[in-house]
């Protein structure tokens, strides 16, 4: 995808915020527990390479990604000796590529290990489906057979075992405890404990520090976003959001009563009013459902009117502004703030989706 460096729309990523979130989390972890930075999906929209560098500077001991290509991108960017785990499914034919690049892979089926062609040792992490229902083995018998397979094959190393909690971001913990118990049953069935036992995502690491095991997978909260609104007031420290999204007005005009804007003419002025066109649209991740949401102009709310277009969006101004005036879509402006949580609430989604949707057509600028 082409990045739009030559238009006035950009994302600012505050590296100091990422470092602070990591340090605050590390301060509550035992020294024996590693923090792995989850940088999948372009670091939740924040930029995988720069975030990985920032996280490593802050003390992260490794990285988690969703697909092998993300792991290879880290290797190509210079992270040659760092621990990297692919959390998602990888094709069998790509196992050798991972092995040669010292990338750890998730294994969740016995048959995946059959007839592998490897030129180097493949490090694997056994995924346990303790109740998430996506990937993973579900019985002690499966776990023991996979352990035996890895023990009998000198090119396989059972480096880790893990699970993922479905409800760690909820205050009610009965299902979480049920998952943890099932995982522990499978863990204790192994003859030898792997080097890395890990279960905690951001929510679990924040609210259930006792289950850190050997490492935590620090994702959404590394970026300063709460895992869910339900637990926001129960967090052990304040999270510092790292992402801000800005643009500028490229056209300002006054509408007369009866004038309409955008596709479908769904918005019609009922009085004289000032509007501005912004060079950002749903092709950038500002999806059509943002219509009716507000941005900030000089600290004042300005609603998005009409339909969001592919490349442009129109807002209603509180008064006349000059072309080139700055607009805050996510971030702080003169004491007021629009957050990813605000957008998520309006869109009936979660903050993860808000930032992940912001694609690479919007340039990232890294500050602090």
Swiss-Prot record:
N6-(pyridoxal phosphate)lysine modified-residue sites: 40
Cofactors required: pyridoxal 5'-phosphate
Superkingdom of this protein's organism: Bacteria
Positions annotated as active site in the UniProt record: 40 (proton acceptor), 263 (proton acceptor)
Pathway the protein contributes to: Amino-acid biosynthesis; D-alanine biosynthesis; D-alanine from L-alanine: step 1/1
Enzyme class: isomerase
Name under which the protein is recorded: Alanine racemase
Species whose genome carries this gene: Listeria monocytogenes serotype 1/2a (strain 10403S)
Keyword Isomerase: yes
């Amino acid at each position: 995808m082409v990045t739009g460096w030559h238009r006035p729309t950009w994302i600012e990523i505050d590296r100091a915020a990422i470092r602070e979130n990591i340090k605050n989390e590390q301060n509550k972890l035992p020294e024996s527990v590693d923090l792995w930075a989850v940088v999948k999906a372009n670091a939740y929209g924040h930029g995988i390479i720069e975030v990985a560098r920032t996280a490593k500077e802050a003390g992260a001991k490794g990285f988690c990604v969703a697909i092998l290509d993300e792991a290879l991108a880290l290797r190509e960017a210079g992270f040659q000796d760092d621990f990297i785990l692919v959390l998602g499914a990888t094709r069998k034919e790509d196992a050798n590529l991972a092995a040669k690049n010292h990338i750890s892979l998730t294994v969740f089926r016995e048959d995946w290990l059959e007839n592998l062609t490897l030129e180097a040792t493949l490090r694997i992490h056994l995924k346990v489906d303790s109740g998430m229902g996506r990937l993973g083995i579900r019985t002690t018998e499966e776990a023991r057979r996979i352990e035996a397979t890895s023990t009998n094959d000198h090119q396989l190393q059972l480096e880790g075992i893990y699970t993922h909690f479905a409800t760690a971001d909820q205050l009610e913990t009965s299902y979480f405890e049920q998952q943890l118990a099932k995982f522990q049953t499978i863990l204790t069935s192994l003859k030898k404990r792997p080097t890395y036992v890990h279960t905690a995502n951001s929510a679990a690491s924040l609210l259930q520090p006792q289950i850190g095991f050997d490492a935590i997978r620090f994702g959404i909260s590394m970026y300063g976003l709460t895992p869910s609104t339900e637990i926001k007031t129960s967090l052990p420290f304040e999270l510092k959001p790292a992402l801000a999204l800005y643009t500028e007005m490229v056209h300002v005009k006054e509408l007369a009563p009866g004038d309409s804007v955008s596709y479908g003419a769904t918005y019609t002025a009922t009085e004289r009013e000032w509007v501005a066109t912004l060079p950002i649209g749903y092709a950038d991740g500002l999806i059509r459902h943002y219509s009716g949401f507000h941005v900030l102009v000089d600290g004042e709310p300005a609603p998005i009117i009409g339909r969001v277009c592919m490349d442009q969006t129109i807002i209603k101004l509180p008064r006349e502004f000059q072309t080139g005036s700055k607009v805050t879509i996510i971030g702080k402006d003169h004491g007021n703030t629009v957050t990813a949580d605000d957008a998520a609430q309006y869109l009936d989604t979660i903050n993860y989706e808000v930032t992940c949707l912001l694609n690479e057509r919007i340039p990232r600028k890294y500050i602090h």
